């Protein structure tokens, strides 16, 4: 990904970065799924707190708060909705194969 980003335009580089970050969100969900299966560590409300956190670190949420406007071409981590979706995808499936953000619509 890093090599592709170096050869891409700024917008394309940002899009690759978003895909990589969303994949990381999905993998975090996969980790939480499997850890919960082994240890039952998730308590009531934990998943909602994780979703709320994912929402609050979306590029659109952060840009709106900081600048008062949203510039999607400048996203490097994904929108709030994307981050919630991909974390939830990993959490619900527990399957790494479902985290292929490079070959799916994001």
How would you label these PLM feature ranges?
Residues 1-76, 84-85, 92-106:
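A Zn2+-metalloprotease active-site environment signal
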């Amino acid at each position: 990904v890093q090599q592709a980003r170096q050869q891409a335009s700024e917008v394309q580089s940002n899009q690759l970065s978003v895909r990589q970050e969303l994949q990381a969100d999905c993998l975090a969900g996969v980790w939480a799924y499997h850890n919960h299966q082994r240890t039952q560590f998730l308590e009531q409300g934990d998943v909602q707190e994780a979703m709320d956190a994912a929402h609050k670190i979306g590029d659109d949420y952060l840009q709106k708060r900081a600048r008062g406007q949203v510039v999607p071409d400048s996203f490097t981590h994904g929108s709030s909705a994307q981050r919630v979706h991909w974390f939830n995808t990993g959490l619900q499936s527990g399957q790494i194969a479902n985290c292929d953000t490079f070959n799916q619509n994001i």
